[in-house]
Amino acid sequence: MKNIVKVAALTAIALAAVSSAALVGCKKKDNAVLTVGATPEPHAAILNLIAPDLAKEGITLKVVEFTDYITPNDAVESGQIDANFFQHVPYMESFNKEKGYHLVSVVGTHVEPLALYSKKFKALADIPAGATIAIPNDPTNEGRALLLLQSAKLITLDPKAGLTATPQNVTENAKKFQFKEIEAASLPRVLADVDGAVINGNYALPAGLNAKKDGLLIEGADSPYVNVVTVKAGNENDPRIKALVKAITSDKVREFIKTKYPNGDVVPTF
């Protein structure tokens, strides 16, 4: 009788263990998909590169491509996607402040130097007085573009404006440039219609623009605008996110960036 009870008890324990394992397995299966929003290049290209590595960890990486700088942050905050990969910290922080969001960076990966391009002029000195210069209209990238122009002594900004400078903060403009504030994604399309445009690397690349070859003025490689993987606060320790961080900062990714972008259009920072 004691043996029967013992066997019954062991069977119950075994069944409980199997049941628990099944529950864990289901939970793991439910959480195995990781959805990350990204702009096409280089972000989506990098994510697609590491998808097989995450698959080995039991994680299916789903890459959702966006062509603007607003929707991917809305999607992370609302929980529609798990993370995004397209922005730098100053932009993320300004977005949090403006919308009351709770976005945080989990890892920095690379810098995409900003550059001034022109279809009409071949040298910076050729840009005439009164020229129209298109710049990004989002808070941090607009300030970043103006700081780039200031670095070449084309304009002077009020030092109090900092990274969020706008054309209203220009205190000296000897050549009387006219600034056209345009959504960053649209800048390559309007390049032919203006005298010059300051374009973010992730939009310049798909448009066939090479910063080193085509840029009249290029941001230094020591730029503080490192691109990051962003999640909603509280999700930093999600095992899927940790696996993504490990994969996206691997030697494989570093070599991919150096090989695919040998002209410094994208510079790894890890």
Locate each region found by the language model.
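Beta->alpha turn/N-cap motifs
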Residues: 41, 67-69, 79, 83-93, ...
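Ligand-binding "clamshell"
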Residues: 94-106, 120-121, 193, 198, ...
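Short, well-ordered beta-strand elements
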Residues: 30-41, 59-65, 132-133
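A conserved helix-loop-strand patch within extracytoplasmic ligand-binding domains
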Residues: 106-155, 254
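Periplasmic-binding protein-like
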Residues: 141-150, 248-268
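Short helix-initiation/N-cap motifs at beta->coil->alpha
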Residues: 63-74, 161-189
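Short, low-complexity disordered leader/linker segments with a strong preference
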Residues: 1-33, 269
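A bilobed periplasmic-binding-protein/Venus flytrap-type ligand-binding module shared by bacterial periplasmic
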Residues: 113-124, 226-238
